Amino acid sequence: MFIEAIVLALTALILYSVYSVKSFNTTRPTDPPVYPVTVPFLGHIVQFGKNPLEFMQRCKRDLKSGVFTISIGGQRVTIVGDPHEHSRFFSPRNEILSPREVYTIMTPVFGEGVAYAAPYPRMREQLNFLAEELTIAKFQNFVPAIQHEVRKFMAENWKEDEGVINLLEDCGAMIINTACQCLFGEDLRKRLNARHFAQLLSKMESSLIPAAVFMPWLLRLPLPQSARCREARAELQKILGEIIVAREKEEASKDNNTSDLLGGLLKAVYRDGTRMSLHEVCGMIVAAMFAGQHTSTITTSWSMLHLMHPKNKKWLDKLHKEIDEFPAQLNYDNVMDEMPFAERCVRESIRRDPPLLMVMRMVKAEVKVGSYVVPKGDIIACSPLLSHHDEEAFPNPRLWDPERDEKVDGAFIGFGAGVHKCIGQKFALLQVKTILATAFREYDFQLLRDEVPDPDYHTMVVGPTLNQCLVKYTRKKKLPS
């Protein structure tokens, strides 16, 4: 009886495997072309994970289409890899192309009822609150604060006249230090210094399972990192709660108008007249830092790595021509209005090696993309990595060329587009450009390998391979006046 049950189960499994492969490979005339599946359940996950750029380019080439469907863990994923069709992905409302289902993995980190785990009208209000705290009016004093933190870090960690550092690690520290200095009040920084905050974020990040986007059942596994995530978030919320109580006492006794990110979110009022809860405030602070920390770290690192490479000396010389004319203490206008080439360097680094491989949505209602109709139930994805390597839009795409312009309007999607365009774009540019200008004015750098590092596609947010980022720094003899 037992053997018969096993045979029956195996037979059912084999039949289902054959059915699933045949079902995926059989399409309607209006469906995007599919890249054939031969391995049931896993689909193309191994090929995609090994080298996503090479695999997606092969699909696009073999299928002769910039819009195509692959299978990842048994889930149909339709990729919009034609820059001409980007608007078809970024324009539809959340109710048609929904981010909630694919970003359920973030709920333990941000919290229930926050961002993608909130109803869409509430999510839009929360993002608007965050956007109001990242306006140009609030940026005016940020540049001196960023420079102060960068110089403080360099003085404490690059103590000798020359030495060897891991640039990716050091950029990560400078990004979190400068973000905390700009966005948090003094009371919050005293209770939650940048190092401690980075540790809490790391614990929360370690709980994420990227494959759960395509295989949601993975989220139900009782993994130990899930418990660590809950503990880290609870600790952060406890610290914020204590600071809020202390601020309320100060405000009762004197005029206290702390204008940091925490203060702004605490004053935010929903349309129904209610204020954000402590749980929601904590989630939005985590979301803001989570969204920016890795992407800005990676962008700063790539920009510096390319600029210090000998083959890019003409670009470094051009950067120096731009930044060396400014006083040692920069201001907002210097950074945002008078450094166009530095911004080109940053954007080209994002273009060549975008931190996010794909931006995804769940198709809730059939949507037309080009001559195809993407069926309900697909995950639809737009890949900055694939689109930024489109030969028509960006000829010779692996060449780092800050003076290139996109040949197809809307091809660059490094900061998103449409209704979900990155609300932290201006802060990120301010932060990265200030770090670049300060570091290259005061130090010379030498990459300790022949070529720029390879992208590490095994991390959730893709940056240069960590062990390839060793760099020699040399303090300049005389700082610019």
Curated annotation (Swiss-Prot):
EC number: 1.14.14.154
Record's bilayer topology term: Single-pass membrane protein
Transmembrane parts of this sequence: 1-21
UniProt KW keywords: Heme, Iron, Lipid biosynthesis, Lipid metabolism, Membrane, Metal-binding, Monooxygenase, Oxidoreductase, Steroid biosynthesis, Steroid metabolism, Sterol biosynthesis, Sterol metabolism, Transmembrane, Transmembrane helix
Domain of life from the UniProt record: Eukaryota
Chain segments annotated as coiled-coil in the UniProt record: none
Known catalytic reactions: a 14alpha-methyl steroid + 3 reduced [NADPH--hemoprotein reductase] + 3 O2 = a Delta(14) steroid + formate + 3 oxidized [NADPH--hemoprotein reductase] + 4 H2O + 4 H(+)
GO biological process, one term: sterol biosynthetic process
Cofactors (names): heme
Keyword Cell membrane: no
SUPFAM superfamilies hit by this protein: Cytochrome P450 (SSF48264)
Primary role: Catalyzes C14-demethylation of lanosterol which is critical for ergosterol biosynthesis. It transforms lanosterol into 4,4'-dimethyl cholesta-8,14,24-triene-3-beta-ol. Favors C4 dimethylated substrates, the substrate preference order is 24-methylenedihydrolanosterol > 24,25-dihydrolanosterol > lanosterol > obtusifoliol > norlanosterol.
Family affiliation: Belongs to the cytochrome P450 family.
Protein name per its UniProtKB record: Sterol 14-alpha demethylase
Gene: CYP51
